[in-house]
Amino acid sequence: MSTQNSEAFYGHPGGLKTLFVTEMWERMSYYGMRALLVLFMTATLQEGGLGITIASATAIYGLYTGTVYFMGLPGGWIADRLLGGQRAVWYGGIIIMFGHIVLAIPNDKTFFIGLILVILGTGLLKPNIGAMVGQLYSENDKRRDSGYAIYYMGINLGSFIGYLICGYLATDFGWHYAFGAAAIGMAAGLIQYKMTTQKLEGVGAKPVAPLSAIGQRNSWMVIVAGLVSIAVITLLTFQGVIVIDPIALAQYVAVAFTLIFVVYYAVIYFCSGLTGNEKKKLWALLLICIASACFWSGFEQAGSSLNLFARDYTDRMIGSFEIPTAWFQFSNSMFIVLLSPFFAAFWIKLGQRMVTPAYGIKCAAGLIIMASGFIVMFFAAQYAASGLQVAPGWLITTYFLHTVGELCLSPIALSAVSKLSPRRFAGQMMGVFVLTYSIGNIISGLLAGNYDPNNVEQIPALYIQISLFSIGIGIVILLVGLKSRFWEALKTEEDDTAAPVQGNNGTTTTA
């Protein structure tokens, strides 16, 4: 792909602006709704919510966020084989928009239909828009990392807007106005995308590895059959023929995703003709995958138990103004914007001093720092258990520590996947790694189910257990990382002959 473009965007190809703005509005819709999901489901019927238990609501939340990541795997495949990135992003955005429109309808059944549509649409849009950013640049273009940094800013700007607007609307006008605003945001992104698609200059216009005519026909038949199956199961559930326990379902799905991860990883390790050095690198990568799953199981408490703590036990009054509960969650976006330049400079400075911590050590540090945020919440919950409303600073401090942990782990882990995976399996390994997000998110929802506002004395135990478990795993990874750093440095035959592969199953951000 030529990187020349007559309408440059801060010195980058003009197509970056198209993808930046589209992703900004998509993330606005996603995070705006995500911040309200558990709050809406646990609100009473009189408050306009669904009135379901916290354990069920957080399990549904975990299933939703975990499945969104999982659906990126077939979404990337569909773009690579059938649609091309441009059409995948377009159709995915349309499905997301209709999902939010359905969510705006005040009906419990349409709520779950809306969630399914958002999951399907995000799975089609999210992995492919990130892959197209990379395709804007030629193989050795030094602007690539900077381009992804700009793209990442769009993600955080979108999440900030989503938390701000949807959080305000939910508090002052009602839940469904907030869901409707998410639909408007996605519509704005789609309009901009359609009007500026030409700036992509052919990037993602066609599938990169198209199937034969017969293969395409068979694939579409499988896709249609899958969608029909989802529709039938949904209908039977609404009619009471099938009864779904969201907690049990989340447990089964977490086990299923873990088994898929283990089997896929084992097949690549044992059945792919890897060299000894490649296998040792995969052992080093496995540590990072474990750290990732554990990290997200704690970090994603932001939308569930920490969100509920903000609602139930945090003093949100500033004079006569009550801070909307969802607004606390944009602390993460704000801290990422403020801290990202510092961390980028910090890693460079360490490299200049010939101090380069191993991937496993960095990820272990990120996990332990995230866990320290729950030590803060342990003390905050103890104050709440004594009958006090706690100051907002407790939650903000927790989100600060979580963000520091994220910046130590998330971009480092993605870099590790590209560095430690055998080059010929780089795209597949990124897809396997994405499963750690799914596993972590579902476990997060199950853990949050132990939050019980009617038994506030037990909440400190929830947070200290999450903290101690994460710290324990982090210490083990740190100790093993002292050995795995030698595995990470091993050379393979491909290292000197091949360039990194970027597929549609992964991007440079987890957001």
Give the role of each language-model region.
Residues 58-79, 126, 330-343, 439:
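Central cavity-lining transmembrane alpha-helices of secondary-active solute carriers
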Residues 72-101, 105:
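Conserved MFS/SLC helix-loop-helix module at the cytosolic interface between two early adjacent transmembrane helices
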Residues 81-93, 278, 349-368:
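Cytoplasmic membrane-interface "Motif A"-like loop-to-helix N-cap segments
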Residues 1-14, 139, 170-305, 312-317, ...:
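Intracellular loop-helix junctions on the cytosolic face of multi-pass helical membrane proteins
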Residues 35-58, 302-328:
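Short amphipathic helix-loop junctions that connect adjacent transmembrane helices
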Residues 99, 110-125, 386-408:
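Hydrophobic core of transmembrane alpha-helices in multi-pass small-molecule transporters
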Residues 68, 143-171, 178-189, 193, ...:
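Glycine-rich segments within core transmembrane alpha-helices of 12-TM secondary carriers
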Residues 94-112, 364-387:
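C-terminal ends and interior cores of transmembrane alpha-helices
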